[in-house]
């Protein structure tokens, strides 16, 4: 499917349940890889080992003392990602959310934007997800191009000194990172825990 066969418009009320499921599916595809990446870093392994050792004095089961800290840590990572990306945000200062729609009317992607925290930060992508049945068909690039156009228009209307778009990407989402780098984005910082990055932020001056 060529990108020219796609249109982008604001989500309709009757489409919101479908879009919400798309967002949840997108998070589910990456949360296990992010959790694995986070919990195999040396500081995390050290903390898990210390927690397991402490629990062995409280719990009668060695296996439970070993697995409980891992289960709780994985759950915390998953809940954090779901809270951040697994819900449909309300309309923001840049409008939206928007959906990518095929000519047949099938919703195949979702996008949401928000202004940056400080003046000059530009716009931020807060949601970007493509249905697993429509990936590698130009949907992500079409949504990204639409986001860039909205960011430029918003920056001009607000008198911002520059038009800029920031896209956060989970560390395990190599396909999205590759697409952004191919479109001229550069990784600049991110956030995580214990000194290790879990989400990288890609930015581009438009």
Curated annotation (Swiss-Prot):
Chief location category: membrane
Record-stated family: Belongs to the camello family.
Cellular component GO terms held in the UniProt record: membrane
The protein, known as: Probable N-acetyltransferase 14
Protein task: Probable acetyltransferase. May act as a transcription factor regulating the expression of coproporphyrinogen oxidase by binding to a promoter regulatory element.
Membrane topology: Single-pass membrane protein
Stretches assigned to the N-acetyltransferase domain: 55-206
Listed PANTHER family: GNAT FAMILY N-ACETYLTRANSFERASE, N-ACETYLTRANSFERASE 14-RELATED
Listed transmembrane segments: 57-77
Cellular localisation: Membrane
GO molecular function: DNA binding; N-acetyltransferase activity
EC number: 2.3.1.-
Organism the protein comes from: Macaca fascicularis
Pfam families: Acetyltransf_1
Signal peptide positions on this chain: none
